[in-house]
Amino acid sequence: MMEHPENSEEYKGLTVNAGIEQPSMVNPYLKLRKKPRRREYSVDEFVDGIVKGNVTILSQAVTMVESLKPEHQAIAQEVIEKCLPYSGNSVRIGISGVPGAGKSTSIDVFGLHVLEKGGKLAVLAIDPSSERTKGSILGDKTRMEKLSVHPKAFIRPSPSAGSLGGVARKTRETIILCEAAGFDKIFVETVGVGQSETAVHSMVDFFLLIQLAGTGDELQGIKRGIMEMADGIVINKADGSNIEKAKLAAAHFRNALHLFPTPDSGWTPKVLTYSGFYGLGIQEIWEMVDEYFEFVKKNGYFDYRRNEQAKYWMYETINEHLRDSFYNNPTIETMLAAKEQAVLNGSQTSFVAAKQLLDTYYQLLK
């Protein structure tokens, strides 16, 4: 095809208009507008706002907790320390289940039910993150349609950033801040994959496992450890033609639980059916939860579990700081690449390479 037909004798009658340049899709005046800077609060302002129940300040404090910047971490740790005396007065419930079990929809219904009795609810929804990009869907809030607009509810979807089992590294600190802000009920939802349940179990008082009926072998793919952690198991979507399947699934789970030793709490986990979509069976689930708390507070296990969790997180924090200190050391960073290559080409064993790295690190500490 000829590039400029207007210059050819063959097309001498052809005229070409210059045309009109299309305007930019970006409003040029936006560049002139100054972005409003988010106000930076002092530690005392953070604490005062949180204790007074200011959700805006609470959200900013949680952002500081999740930040990887050292200056933000320093402020966050001070805020947490000062909020600690106001925490510990909530009911912490972990909610997990296979992907597609309807966790977010169920939390929407559960949350509205507990808020009818009074109090405030914080939902910490842990979204799956990509192991490659560390990106997160952060879509849980959109699936909690009614709860997300409730004045007494605070929903905080947090990216798991590839941490252990998909659980956000700073969830426990966020729980402390939410409790200090007056939220007396805390829900922690896990991604339902990997080892996330173990981490959540170590920061909640009651662990609720949501399962589905009518998916074939109901017990297939459920790890023994997760079953042992559950304080209650509920079968979702028990409605319509699925009711009988849900009852059968519940029977399978009850039989399986009989094979496990009695939990340290002395509580025998119950299995119930419900429909999150239609809101059926919700009352019975929360009667079970209330019964559990009455049981463990009476026999002293509630306080024992809280103390064990505090001890666990002390060791986890130590491990985390030691790990960060090691991997962020400039000398170690340089050595790691060389040692990794030595292991890959077979010139060194994994154990020798690791020992040399650790010996170097210990020498640097002297």
Predicted regions and their residues:
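Non-catalytic terminal/linker segments enriched in charged/polar, low-complexity residues
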Residues: 1-85, 333, 337, 354, ...
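Alpha-helical scaffold elements adjacent to nucleotide-binding pockets in ATP/GTP-utilizing enzyme cores
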Residues: 137, 174, 199, 203, ...
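Flexible active-site lid/hinge loop adjacent to a nucleotide/diphosphate
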Residues: 213-244
